[in-house]
Amino acid sequence: MAGLLSTFDTFSSRRSESINKSGGGAIIPGQRSTVSVFILGPSVTDDADKLLIATTFLAHSLDTDKQHSQRGGFLVSLLAMAYSSPELYLTTNGVNADVKYVIYNIERDPKRTKTDGFIVKTRDMEYERTTEWLFGPMINKNPLFQGQRENADLEALLQTYGYPACLGAIIVQVWIVLVKAITSSSGLRKGFFNRLEAFRQDGTVKSALVFTGDTVEGIGAVMRSQQSLVSLMVETLVTMNTSRSDLTTLEKNIQIVGNYIRESGLASFMNTIKYGVETKMAALTLSNLRPDINKLRSLVDIYLSKGARAPFTCILRDPVHGEFAPGNYPALWSYAMGVAVVQNKAMQQYVTGRTYLDMEMFLLGQAVAKDADSKISSALEEELGVTDTAKERLRHHLTNLSGGDGAYHKPTGGGAIEVAIDHTDITFGAEDTADRDNKNWTNNSNERWMNHSINNHTITISGAEELEEETNDEDITDIENKIARRLADRKQRLSQANNRQDASSDADHENDDDATAAAGIGGI
């Protein structure tokens, strides 16, 4: 039997291995599109010209009349301006199964009076039509930078801070967009400006060069549609040699942004390991957590097999990235989130009210995290030489710290979960009131939250979803009206009862209505 169980324990990891392994056979290349990339030739030496070209690339990348592949090519051209050898940058990081980059040079021609004196060319020929298309008149539907709304002088910024700082401010913001563009498009604009604040405070990005919200959304849309652009940026982070002592300021800033990009979309997976497994509490021995633990173990093996690109599994849309979703290990994730909201206050803002949340495991995680004995690591006791007296004092302090907070945290961010908690315990029948009293229900919302079973029926996600569908504004209005009528009737009956001198306390209790209890519970 032991051998049979061990076979099942390793099944998840072996199954994942078999899915990821190649079945052999010939490798058949897919279709690749051609993307034009423009780089600065040696004749373009003036800093004002360079900044003009950079803003031209940015403007073209936001032009909704162009194909997304063309817009992506302009963003690649902009990113390549950070390096002294754009060709080497693209050769090193731009190898991609989806696209083939065709490089064109932009040169300065003193004889030309149109197109700002620029010409697009290769070694063999010049491209007049491409030059006019690139440097011809453009209608910017929206300003690129917030400073343009205030008529800020970019040339003055260039003279004050220099070309590298101005170019770096633009490129860093493109990198910041990637942090949320793929994994959280709905929160892109807010996330962008939150991440940008640190770079504004240290002077990396000047206020006049801050992207507008429309610019951020436009770049994000291109990134979501052009996986080749995202792959290029990820390869830049993977191949960037962090041990170099001669990193430019822009490269250092790219690495800082890269720390936010790494493991983007894997927060649930990492938090489950951090709060669910690494805390090493006794709850991990529960049998209903074992399947999820085995699943998590197989995911760890998959993650490690990806090597340097493992942190970018989601942002690269790796075929296995869906396996890391918490819905594949819901019980363990729910338990870990319960531990997290107790141990880390910042995690109380994390969206836990999801359809696959296991309420029992979520509450169990909070319970064990609040328990003083569970907070003491037996593995470290021997290593640190902690005495029994010291352990008792530590338990005493932990109990005092957590003793005043007996409330359990509710899930956040999930409409179905919130509705289930807020409305399922609204009852108006006398039999329901008696049933509630028999089960020692209380009007205190915190105590009621700890005892989350109602009528011997634990709140389920499916029931919550049905309740959310059935509950509307008219239902809530009806409930409010019923409560108002009940309160009025109760007030009248209490007034009549006070006039009866021979009324007993038991009779008063029988006349007591449950509307007040329902209102006190917080059902509305």
UniProtKB/Swiss-Prot annotation:
It is found in: Virion; Host cytoplasm. Residues 494-504 have a biased composition (Polar residues). Residues 462-471 are annotated as: Interaction with the phosphoprotein. Residues 4-404 are annotated as: Ncore. Keywords: Capsid protein, Helical capsid protein, Host cytoplasm, Ribonucleoprotein, RNA-binding, Viral nucleoprotein, Virion. Its main location: virion. InterPro entries: Paramyx_ncap. GO terms for cellular component: helical viral capsid; host cell cytoplasm; ribonucleoprotein complex; viral nucleocapsid. Residues 490-524 are annotated as: Disordered. GO terms for molecular function: RNA binding; structural molecule activity. Residues 405-524 are annotated as: Ntail. RNA binds at residues 180, 190, 195, 260, 350, 354. Residues 440-461 are annotated as: Homomultimerization. Belongs to the paramyxoviruses nucleocapsid family. Forms the helical nucleocapsid (NC) in a ratio of 1 N per 6 ribonucleotides, protecting the genome from nucleases. The encapsidated genomic RNA serves as template for transcription and replication; encapsidation by N is coupled to RNA synthesis. Forms the encapsidation complex with the phosphoprotein protein P. Before encapsidation, the newly synthesized free N protein, so-called N0, is chaperoned by P. Homomultimer; forms the nucleocapsid. Binds to the viral genomic RNA. N0 interacts with the phosphoprotein (via N-terminus); this interaction allows P to chaperon N0 to avoid N polymerization before encapsidation. Interacts as N-RNA template with the phosphoprotein (via C-terminus); this interaction positions the polymerase on the template. Ncore is globular and carries regions required for self-assembly and RNA-binding. Ntail is an intrinsically disordered monomeric domain in the C-terminus. This is Nucleoprotein. It comes from Human parainfluenza 1 virus (strain C39) (HPIV-1). The gene is N.
